[in-house]
């Protein structure tokens, strides 16, 4: 779609007070500066609906990732997780619309959810894990207020930023393959295809068919490919289950059938289930690394996404500054705390916001529309819960593949870049630890730069990270040597 040529309306400070709005416009126009940004109410509504359709899959994927047990063996209910995911996305996106006044939508970040499920919950209770999420959100907000967020962003080498995104992509894809039953732990090998070296059962075949269908839709450039693929995979699943073709026990998350009506009251049972105590059992070093990993997981993509979508909407100037940038970054950080209190994990800006911009969205009104759609989903939990876990898992693999596309930005001919990137990317899924991947990449980057005599290119922040990560890897031997373990 050809976009209109719009000059930037303001500088980096907050949204739109200086936008030129003709007299006689409606309060809606005046508040969101719709005319001032060359848009219309119809375009904003269309953009908001498009953005929702592009990211509605999160209502299925986030509960799937957070479905595991915590250290006490407790799990979070699927209906409660769907409610929490919809509520947190609605509140965060509405805040971005009404306060930030920019066309950005937020929802649970799969990278943050992956850290919570794989590294945090196994060490503590889910309530304590959500407390960690709140802490991560508060830290992000403090970094924005103090101006340190941008400083830290600039201190991390760009190749490592891409590597972290790629590594999390592989990590998320592995979760998807495992949830679908496509990959199992083998008896004589770490992993194997299916439970015995082969695919078994209709559900896993439905996963494979859904995965291919989404990839084909994306290759054709079909809008909302992920959501369409999920719907397309769910319909035959419901039919096969209704015809008793599949044993209900084969479905990983229960048979795809509607229990009761399509409409129900939201389940807020996990809302407010947050604890900030009891972290001493896992150790201060572990707590610090977990919080640091959560910050990393939700840190890097947000600013790039905000600036990227702002540029696409022609709101950013030549220096990448855009109306409402400071508020948008702060709300993105607040999303971490909102997600933790809601029980949905940290909220972050979704790159799918660009789909709404492509339909003409230029203001926060489109975000309000998207947020209202998420709010409406609170009352349609049964329809969301009917989607089989195997079908939703296909979307996880697709998201992982999309994150891996950052590989095109890496200079693979430069070993000083390629080796740290490689270690970051592969160690995350191989160790099932995002922290370990980041640590390996940082240490390798500093070591190789030092070996090449380019110490000045490293920077104080990277040196500090290297020391922290060396201690992280050597913590067990150090504790044994000191006799404290």
Q: What is the meaning of each model-derived region?
A:
Residues 122-235, 239, 368-485:
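Membrane-embedded alpha-helical modules
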Residues 45, 65, 152, 224, ...:
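Residue-level signature of catalytic and energy-coupling elements of molecular machines
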Residues 88-109:
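Juxtamembrane transmembrane-helix boundary signature
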Residues 49-56, 91-94, 98, 173, ...:
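Hydrophobic/aromatic residues within the transmembrane alpha-helices of Major Facilitator Superfamily
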Residues 22-34, 77-85, 104-114, 225, ...:
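Hydrophobic alpha-helical transmembrane segments
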């Amino acid at each position: 779609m050809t976009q209109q040529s719009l000059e930037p309306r303001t500088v980096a400070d907050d949204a739109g007070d200086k936008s030129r709005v003709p007299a006689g416009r409606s309060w809606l126009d005046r508040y969101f500066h719709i005319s001032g940004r060359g848009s219309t109410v119809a375009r904003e509504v269309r953009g908001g609906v498009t953005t929702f359709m592009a990211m509605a899959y999160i209502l299925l994927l986030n509960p799937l990732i957070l479905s595991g047990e915590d250290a006490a063996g407790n799990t979070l209910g699927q209906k409660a997780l769907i409610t929490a995911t919809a509520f947190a996305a609605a509140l965060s996106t509405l805040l971005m619309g009404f306060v930030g006044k920019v066309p950005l939508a937020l929802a649970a970040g799969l990278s943050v959810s992956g850290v919570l499920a794989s590294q945090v919950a196994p060490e503590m209770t889910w309530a304590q894990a959500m407390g960690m999420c709140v802490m991560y959100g508060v830290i992000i907000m403090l970094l924005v207020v103090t101006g340190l967020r941008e400083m830290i962003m600039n201190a991390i080498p760009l190749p490592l930023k891409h590597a972290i995104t790629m590594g999390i992509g592989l990590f998320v894809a592995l979760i998807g393959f495992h949830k679908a039953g496509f990959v199992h732990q083998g008896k004589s090998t770490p992993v194997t295809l299916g439970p015995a070296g082969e695919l078994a059962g209709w559900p896993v075949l439905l996963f494979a068919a859904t995965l291919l269908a989404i990839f084909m839709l994306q290759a054709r450039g079909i809008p909302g490919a992920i959501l369409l693929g999920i719907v397309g995979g769910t319909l035959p699943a419901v039919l096969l289950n209704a015809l008793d073709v599949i044993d209900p026990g084969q479905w990983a998350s229960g048979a795809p059938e509607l229990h009761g009506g399509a409409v129900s009251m939201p389940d807020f049972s996990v809302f407010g289930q947050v604890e900030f105590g009891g972290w001493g059992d896992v150790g201060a070093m572990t707590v610090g690394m977990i919080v640091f990993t959560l910050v990393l997981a939700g840190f890097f993509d947000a600013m790039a996404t905000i600036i990227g979508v702002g540029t696409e909407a022609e709101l950013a100037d030549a220096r990448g500054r855009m109306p409402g940038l400071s508020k948008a970054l702060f709300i993105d950080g607040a999303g971490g705390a909102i997600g933790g209190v809601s029980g949905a994990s940290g909220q972050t800006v979704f790159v799918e916001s660009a789909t709404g911009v492509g339909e003409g969205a230029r203001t926060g009104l489109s975000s309000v529309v998207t947020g209202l759609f998420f709010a409406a989903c609170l009352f349609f939990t049964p329809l969301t819960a009917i989607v089989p876990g195997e079908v939703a898992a296909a979307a996880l693999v697709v998201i992982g593949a999309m994150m891996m596309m950052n590989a095109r930005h890496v200079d693979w001919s430069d070993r000083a870049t390629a080796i740290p990137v490689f270690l970051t990317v592969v160690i995350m899924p191989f160790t099932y630890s995002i922290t370990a991947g980041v640590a390996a990449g940082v240490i390798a980057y500093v070591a190789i730069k030092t070996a090449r005599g380019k110490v000045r290119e490293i920077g104080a922040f990277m040196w500090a990270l290297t020391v922290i990560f060396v201690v992280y890897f050597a913590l067990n031997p150090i504790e044994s040597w000191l006799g404290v373990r």
